[in-house]
């Protein structure tokens, strides 16, 4: 009996191409992400993350200068979506960047829960996602939003259709 040969990972050049595509899509092509100033800060499959700076147009409570709750939810949704995308890229690591990118077009949020834990006060915020399940049709993720001091602002969980 022969042992199946493990599938090879995409080359470093292909991975760099995929990483560049993810930056382009998340930072430029998704207009709302661009308007909010989201920047990918990590594509680590264990903890993909995005960051953004506080700006006056992101304030939700004008007296206290707090980050708007909708921005918090959007950042958490984006971080969870990023975790799902990176998880798909890992699951299909034998595919080229263009092949795996085609799979991303089928990802969509079907459920999002946000728990606001502290006031959204800070100069810079980081949203981190963690893939908890990647099935054939549905993926689940958990996420956190922290400020530059590491204070936990919000947590969330989300489910995504992936096929």
Model-predicted regions and their roles:
Residues 1-163:
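Terminal targeting signals and extreme-terminal segments of soluble enzymes
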